[in-house]
Amino acid sequence: MNGNLPHIQIQSPKNSLDHLNNGRQATHNFEHGKPGDREEANGHADAHSSSGRSRYLSSDTNLLRDGSSSLDPLSKHIMKRTRSEKTLSFLNPSRASSNTHLSREGTNRSSNVTRTVSGRKSNHGSSLTDTGESDQLSLKSFGAIRQPSQHRSSLFSRMLGSTSHIFGIREDMDNESSEEERDGIPRVEGNAADPFSWIPDGKNVWDSPPKYIRVLSHNKKEKSLDHLFLAQELYCKPTLAATHDRYYEPRATDFPNLAHESSEPSSSRHTADAQSITNASVHLHNSSSPLNRTPSVISDTLAVAITSNSSSNSSNNAIWAMKFSRDGRYLAVGGQDRILRIWAVLDSEHARSVASETCSSDPNNPKLNLKAPVFSEAPIREYAGHTADILDLSWSRNNFLLSSSMDKTARLWHPVRKDCLCCFEHSDFVTSIAFHPKDDRFFLSGSLDCKLRLWSIKEKAVSFWNELPELITAVAFSPDGGLAIAGTFVGLCLFYDTRGLRFRTQMSIRSSRGKNAKGSKVTGIQTRTQMIDNIAGDTEMLVTTNDSRIRIYNLRDKSLELKFKGHANAQSQNRAYFDDDGNYVICGSEDHQVFIWDLPPQHMHKTKKKKHEHFKASVRPITAAVFAPTKTKQLLTLSGDPVYLAAISARRSSVISNASIETGPSLRNLKSLSHSYLPIEIMKGHIIVCGDLDGRIRVFRQDSVFAARKLIEKKNIERKNSETLSNSSFFPQALKAHMNSISSPKRHFSLRHKKNASQITNNENNGNDDIKKGDEPEEEHVGLRKNSTQEKNANLDPNEALKRADMMMLQEGASSMVYYSLTNLDNPGATVNEAAKTAATIEQNEHEIQTSVDPISNVKAILPNADDVSSKNSSTEDQLECLRCGNSLFNVFSRSFVFEGAKFSIVCSHCNRKLLKSGSDDGSETHEMSTLP
């Protein structure tokens, strides 16, 4: 069996412990291997296969420093190793048509330039072509991607014409035009949008509303991601010279391949044993290590490499990997500039105020304040430990971060530490990594040496490993961690038991027919467990490939459930991701767009009409796109985020006034918000983060309270029109007819009398029915309310009854396009003062209460009849409610006006508002509607 394995060229440091025994399970007894008897020439070995494996050459050190091409470096190197002429022509279609001289020269090279490495041929007698021509292939503009090939249409399609394609375009355009006509707001392309900003002009009003971007939909009547706007822009800028103290400083001795490349012979830098595997060259940076220190100067090797790279080509900032931490607090970004950056989510009022000051500190910036940021402007950590492109990232449950790179290493980080915690060396490019979902002590790595490794961080060594038949490009775990999955360059997915990495089964990710029937490179794998009514269902596996397709498989029986298309993913490392709720799948596209597909219900998985939405997100190809997790939304809510604050205000019981906008209010009500519950407006307020080929990170947010704001504005207009109606002087008909026309621009805070509804009912029934008309009764405090409300709240807890009364109140006073302002309820000083005044008033009224008189018997004309109480179909015109607060519980006091021999006044028990008062102390009273100051 070992004779059929390919001879793999391994490059490793001189002192690395790469040699293992022949067994598949790794041990700690390492021995230095001896060079084999096979021939070597210029440090390269033959690559041959007898089992249909891909042909590839060993890594070249010069390829690590090649930053001139804008193409995904991993795809470029794999193409060079596999000698895929089809892929090379795919990258530059004009190479054979537009450039005649190059085509003619390429034809001549086909017979002359082909040569072997150091004048030798492979064992199969085929020649290995020169890499000089492929090295010169460079895409100046990655945006000029290959257009879809024009296939010859069939007879049936010629008879039908191209109506289906035309109808599809019309459908998208009609959806967009109807959306603009419906809300009357023009939209711009996402790649031309500016971040939403606010310029204060002294009145605290919005200078201009945010520009919603144009979102196109397919097979959808209503868009799920309408009213998107650009909220923030972040940049991966090379700031090593200015902030070198943020970087981890590796020494030159840590990289013997780069430091001693010119002094040592090439044969001394290679390992001859083809059956050995890189395992234990692990640098643990503990407290005693000299590397665990804050650098005073920048490493010369690293500084020169980064400075020369930045000066020679300023566009080498492409983003290849982007991941949110599991707790939603951090966003890690890595890419072509070799620097790992971590941004923090604004999770407190202080962090948001600091971010606002940072945004407004630039006098040359006309936009002084970004009002909807998600992250801090500057990254909290910038690590420069890697010496080549960063390809993949993985977060653990405890916020440990793993990064894999083309420098043949995987490194361990943590945001609270300024340096690298551990370095795990491999024999080839580490293309993908994944933390174990249940145990942070283990992680899975896949590399281009066709070996799948399960590492133990505690032991700093490989626990298990296995060899695959193809180049590994993606790895993942099952949700329970019992299954390890690896995707290959030819579209093969292999499944292994995590313990021991024993092979279980495999499946081919390819189309049944057409040009993609041979399989394409797997760029990403993600698994999740379906939740149906909070019950765990089947496990799904999301697979992204380079044939511009995204597939969802059932992990139990390996059956294909869904297949999405529409985006362009031919040569990039774009990966598709689920959102937290499992309702959408998101992926970036090489045509500068972001695509979002709807996940249909389980019983509709076989439907052919796949609904999706897409929008242009940048002027460059999108290389990574993710949804912000739900925990990120919770953190933003607690920090006083303006967008989510508006959603919270739309569900609050307080009445929003037309006061000025408070940019930093005291959010005591948001502090008590449960993390397990969020309003539906916040759940629909999606956040999309995408990165492009220029290193620009764009954050798009959804205005989730757009519909609620429009409804409130409409009700405000109706309320203002109702205020012009004249008030009648007759009671109680005036009270019933004009109760709904009472409105106040400001709510008066009061402590509500927390009496149980059942206790109030007993007091009403046990009163004295005999009232002497000649006596002058003391002021009485009784409950007057609708019996239907009494029956509704009779068995409720007082706090629950008050909460329901709050939910009945109507919100009013929209103040801006996107945001609302809080009332004085969010001002602790004003709240305490109002509460103290109201408490004193209630205490004074309670001293005047006497139980000798029952005014209820004298105002029986106002109360509903017993027949009305028992009737379920009572008229709504007889209901008494205070439209200021929506309360139906009133207090009746004496000595206010004369009615059937007694003087009374009706006051709302919730907002302490006097509804009626007498015009004189004698018997001639005038009933008029009035409000308390």
From Swiss-Prot:
<feature type="compositionally biased region" description="Polar residues">
    <location>
        <begin position="1"/>
        <end position="28"/>
    </location>
</feature>
<feature type="compositionally biased region" description="Polar residues">
    <location>
        <begin position="108"/>
        <end position="135"/>
    </location>
</feature>
<dbReference type="GO" id="GO:0005634">
    <property type="term" value="C:nucleus"/>
</dbReference>
<keyword id="KW-0853">WD repeat</keyword>
<feature type="region of interest" description="Disordered">
    <location>
        <begin position="252"/>
        <end position="275"/>
    </location>
</feature>
<feature type="compositionally biased region" description="Polar residues">
    <location>
        <begin position="87"/>
        <end position="101"/>
    </location>
</feature>
<feature type="repeat" description="WD 1">
    <location>
        <begin position="314"/>
        <end position="353"/>
    </location>
</feature>
<dbReference type="GO" id="GO:0005789">
    <property type="term" value="C:endoplasmic reticulum membrane"/>
</dbReference>
<feature type="compositionally biased region" description="Basic and acidic residues">
    <location>
        <begin position="769"/>
        <end position="783"/>
    </location>
</feature>
<feature type="region of interest" description="Disordered">
    <location>
        <begin position="1"/>
        <end position="135"/>
    </location>
</feature>
<keyword id="KW-0597">Phosphoprotein</keyword>
<feature type="region of interest" description="Disordered">
    <location>
        <begin position="756"/>
        <end position="796"/>
    </location>
</feature>
<feature type="compositionally biased region" description="Low complexity">
    <location>
        <begin position="49"/>
        <end position="59"/>
    </location>
</feature>
<feature type="compositionally biased region" description="Polar residues">
    <location>
        <begin position="757"/>
        <end position="768"/>
    </location>
</feature>
<dbReference type="InterPro" id="IPR040324">
    <property type="entry name" value="WDR44/Dgr2"/>
</dbReference>
<dbReference type="InterPro" id="IPR036322">
    <property type="entry name" value="WD40_repeat_dom_sf"/>
</dbReference>
<feature type="compositionally biased region" description="Polar residues">
    <location>
        <begin position="264"/>
        <end position="275"/>
    </location>
</feature>
<feature type="compositionally biased region" description="Acidic residues">
    <location>
        <begin position="173"/>
        <end position="182"/>
    </location>
</feature>
<dbReference type="GO" id="GO:0006887">
    <property type="term" value="P:exocytosis"/>
</dbReference>
<feature type="repeat" description="WD 3">
    <location>
        <begin position="425"/>
        <end position="465"/>
    </location>
</feature>
<dbReference type="InterPro" id="IPR001680">
    <property type="entry name" value="WD40_rpt"/>
</dbReference>
<keyword id="KW-0256">Endoplasmic reticulum</keyword>
<dbReference type="Pfam" id="PF00400">
    <property type="entry name" value="WD40"/>
</dbReference>
<keyword id="KW-0677">Repeat</keyword>
<feature type="modified residue" description="Phosphoserine">
    <location>
        <position position="722"/>
    </location>
</feature>
<dbReference type="GO" id="GO:0044732">
    <property type="term" value="C:mitotic spindle pole body"/>
</dbReference>
<feature type="repeat" description="WD 7">
    <location>
        <begin position="617"/>
        <end position="657"/>
    </location>
</feature>
<feature type="repeat" description="WD 2">
    <location>
        <begin position="385"/>
        <end position="423"/>
    </location>
</feature>
<keyword id="KW-0539">Nucleus</keyword>
<feature type="repeat" description="WD 8">
    <location>
        <begin position="665"/>
        <end position="710"/>
    </location>
</feature>
<feature type="repeat" description="WD 5">
    <location>
        <begin position="517"/>
        <end position="563"/>
    </location>
</feature>
<protein>
    <recommendedName>
        <fullName>Uncharacterized WD repeat-containing protein C3H5.08c</fullName>
    </recommendedName>
</protein>
<dbReference type="InterPro" id="IPR015943">
    <property type="entry name" value="WD40/YVTN_repeat-like_dom_sf"/>
</dbReference>
<feature type="repeat" description="WD 4">
    <location>
        <begin position="467"/>
        <end position="506"/>
    </location>
</feature>
<feature type="repeat" description="WD 6">
    <location>
        <begin position="568"/>
        <end position="607"/>
    </location>
</feature>
<feature type="compositionally biased region" description="Basic and acidic residues">
    <location>
        <begin position="29"/>
        <end position="47"/>
    </location>
</feature>
<feature type="region of interest" description="Disordered">
    <location>
        <begin position="173"/>
        <end position="194"/>
    </location>
</feature>
